[in-house]
A protein has these predicted regions:
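Membrane-helix interface "capping/anchor" motifs
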Residues: 2-5, 46-57
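Membrane-embedded alpha-helical segments of integral membrane proteins
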Residues: 6-48
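Histidine/glycine-enriched, metal-chelating micro-motifs
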Residues: 18, 39, 102-104, 154, ...
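Internal/C-terminal transmembrane anchor helices
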Residues: 51-78
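Membrane-interface segments at or immediately adjacent to transmembrane helices
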Residues: 73-144, 154
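Short, surface-exposed interaction patches in beta-rich subdomains
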Residues: 118-151, 180, 201-319
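Extended Gly/Ser/Thr-rich low-complexity repeat segments
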Residues: 155-170
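Right-handed parallel beta-helix
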Residues: 169-206, 212
């Protein structure tokens, strides 16, 4: 039996490719080196008069392809990229975040680090990492600093410093959305939408203009210990298609409220304090508090799911 030169060369290539991928090693002119190595092996076999078997040739080709993939950016190891700005660099009091993720979860939260304005982190467990997949761009208009974050494959994490007026607009194709903003009373508006994935928000605000949570295939969960409206008929909308919808909120006085809930196939459970209930069936709920027509600040709250259950707990902030 002849020595399996080609199989040994292919195995060596696989080992090198694996080590490079695991360590994140970047081999500068690896494309040219692969061609040189492959040509040298073929010449050696020709000079030795060795005729490789099909299995040996297959191992060698797989090794070449693996090393080529690693050299062009394919990686099985985790990757993380972070962008940030300090308060000194920013010099704006109102921040508006627009986050779009095709495949990957999005988390939004706050930090007590005194000089941090914002931090955006992209993390990828493994896969194709090509230039332009993750982008962060900014613009300014009317005294508002607008930050647009876009990702194709990565999970996105956004941290914001305290003391800013904030708008959040987040969309994911496949991936959950989590917003943790307890005690962040400067939030102005929130819009979170996931096509496939859950939407979870913990939001406190004393001057809210809109709060919209939507999910096509996934549950929706909203918790708030203080919601105050910044104007009349401020929408608070939770809209799901297939998943359950859960809402537990405490509203500021003396805001007026119109609250409705509905489901096509599921059921509704409710625990309302301080409301006048006009309709309460298995699939529909309607209630009001205060005079919506004359109130300077008021909410229009809607919770609905086409195929899931709806759970509504609502009352008013004590005092």
């Amino acid at each position: 039996m002849s020595f399996p030169y080609l199989r040994v060369a292919g195995g060596a290539l696989l080992v090198v490719a694996g080590l490079a991928a695991y360590s994140g090693l970047s081999v500068g002119a690896s494309g040219a080196l692969i061609l040189v190595f492959g040509g040298a092996v073929v010449l050696m076999l020709a000079l030795l008069g060795h005729r490789p078997r099909a299995w040996d040739a297959a191992v060698f080709i797989v090794g070449l392809l693996a090393l080529s993939a690693v050299s062009t950016g394919y990686s099985f190891g985790p990757r993380s990229v972070t962008y940030s700005a300090t308060r000194t660099q920013l010099r704006y009091n109102t921040l508006s975040f627009t986050v779009v993720s095709s495949t990957g979860s999005v988390s939004l939260g706050f930090t007590n680090r005194p000089n941090l304005a914002y931090q955006v982190n992209f993390s990828t467990a493994g896969g194709i990492e090509t230039p332009g997949v993750n982008t962060v761009t900014n613009s300014t208009a009317g005294g508002v600093f607008n930050l647009k974050v876009s990702s194709t494959w990565s999970s996105v994490s956004v941290l914001v410093g305290r003391g800013f007026s904030l708008d959040f607009n987040v969309t994911t194709g496949t991936g959950s959305i989590d917003l943790e903003a307890p005690g962040a009373e400067a939030i102005r508006s929130v819009s979170l939408y996931s096509s496939i994935g859950s939407v979870n928000a913990v939001v406190d605000s004393s001057a809210l203009t809109a709060l919209i949570l939507r999910a096509d295939f996934g549950s929706i969960n909203l918790v708030s210990h203080h919601l105050g409206a910044a104007g009349a008929r401020v929408p608070v909308t939770l809209s799901g298609t297939t998943g359950s919808v859960h809402m537990s909120v405490e509203l500021a006085r003396p805001d007026a409220v119109s609250l409705t809930a509905s489901t096509a196939i599921g059921s509704i459970s409710q625990s309302l304090s301080g409301f006048n209930i006009s309709q309460n069936t298995r699939t529909d709920l309607a209630a009001t508090a205060g005079d919506l027509a004359s109130a300077e600040n008021s909410f229009v709250v809607t919770a609905s799911s086409s195929l899931g259950s709806v759970d509504v707990t609502a009352g008013f902030v004590p005092g």
